[in-house]
Amino acid sequence: MQLSGAEIMCRILAEEGVTTVFGYPGGAILPFYDALRQSPIQHILTAHEQGAAHAADGFARASGKVGVCIATSGPGATNLVTGLATAFLDSVPVVAITGQVNRALIGHDAFQEVDITGITMPITKHNFLVKKPENLTPTLRLAFQLAREGRPGPVLVDVPRDVQTALIDFEEVRLAELQPLEPDAERVAAAAAAINKAQRPVMLVGGGVINANAEYDAMHLCEKLHIPVVSTLMGIGAISAYRQLFLGMTGLHGHERANNAVKEADLILAVGSRFNDRVTGERSSYSANKLIIHLDIDPAEVDKNIDSGIGITGDMVATLNALEKAAQPHDLSSWWDKINSWPGMDDDFGNEEAPKFFKALNPVLKDKDYIITTDVGQHQMWAAQHLKIQFARQWLTSGGLGTMGFGLPAALGAQLARPQSRVISISGDGGFKMTGSELFTIASNNVPVIAIVFNNSGLGMIRQLQTVQFAKRFTACELPGYVDFVKYAAAFGIEGEHADMPEALAQAVAKAWECRKPYLIEVCINPKNMVLPMVAPGLGINDFVKFANDEIN
């Protein structure tokens, strides 16, 4: 049976379980778009290709499936770069399909020709330029397999226009599934023996737990052993914030109890965490006087940032189950007494105004089917500190790259991935201005995202860092001229309101929840608000910066 390359592309996407793609057309990808008309796959036309990449990312994070974004050659493809880098650093399975100029024109500086495979090599798990029509089917199959198996990540497939139009003898190609990597039994036994002897153990859960769908296995292990649990920014949701074993987020803006527990621990069981600099602070003090057991699917991560006493590479579920069988509970009451003497997640750290808005949302959202997406900056840290996330894939944020503008398009993708849920995008005014045009996409497709914009007329985290590190020499941290984001949303036909008190925000979210349509809420806050606790730059994770109240508000 002969099919055009474009028809094969649509067929493979459908067979791989793709129901929705996010994209923006252009000349080099038009044959694919022509074939897509006859396909059952839903196409969402975004306002910008970066929005398409973030939406595919949000779709993947919310569903656990591969997200797909489409762009044409040249500027269309390069506009995907930030989104692909975001997915790469957070290990998100995304397949990006880009059009390319005809094969005979490649290397001749043709109109809208760029070497997108060369550009994206450092920020994709793998990428392909399809040079022969007969390679199209196996390449697409391999792209999906690579994106989702092992450590997930983005894969780009660059398809020349004449490959899309070529008639190809279609042959079904199915790749053998990769078998889960079993953990080394001797290392598991050594880890279990160390856990059994530890007097001050802590489990650290990272984003790898959620990527592996291993959150229940991690929970069963920590409950059996009654071990305190802390999470990285990306691990939020792996263990419910309402569980007594959960101490909070650790890191440079981590909870005091969580950071102190990590500092005082004699053993850290790290599950799916990269130990990046935002988690560890000063590295030598982080690992001093403790044994670190590091579980990860990717051997390249073990001992990369922190030397582990015991490193175990393998399937996360299999490794956690093996540890649960081998490790035994023992008396940790004195350790828990010490932990409970430190300030907890609900204790205030300074005279902060902004966290009250986030705390006010918890009673409204508890036990509801919701997803939170964020941009990057102060609001992201306040949300991570004060929202009580209950489940995996309920918290979607850009942790590795720290991409401003991620939240709104990611919310679009997440809402389409899980229509039964309600997605709430939380942004600052700076990040929202970067991708706020995706309100067009949300409105035109009636996607019921609730967008909350915290407006301090500036770049709050930059202001905070300039306060701490540059003696209040404020530069380029103000966004002069008030923008009324409620009126901006109204221009797209989206209803909204202002909520300048925590109770008003809670009421506005409850109101928006009841109407199954897009809604925007603007919250104006004092630009002097600080994210606290804050670890002093270059110091250990329990070396907190102290502020006087007049510096905070």
Residues of each region from the PLM?
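Short glycine-rich, flexible loops that bind phosphorylated cofactors or substrates
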Residues: 276-278, 381, 528-530
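Active-site diphosphate/adenylate-binding microenvironment
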Residues: 9, 14, 27, 32, ...
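Hydrophobic, well-ordered secondary-structure elements that form the walls
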Residues: 292, 361, 374, 413, ...
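Catalytic phosphate/nucleotide-handling subdomain of diverse soluble enzymes
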Residues: 406, 410-448, 454
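N-terminal alpha/beta PP-like core and its mobile active-site loop of ThDP/TPP-dependent enzymes
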Residues: 1-327, 364, 448-451, 468-471, ...
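Phosphate/pyrophosphate-binding active-site segments
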Residues: 134, 170, 192-193, 289-376, ...
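Thiamine diphosphate
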Residues: 112, 444-536
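Active-site nucleophile and cofactor-binding loops and adjacent substrate-binding regions
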Residues: 24-26, 44-54, 69-76, 131-132, ...
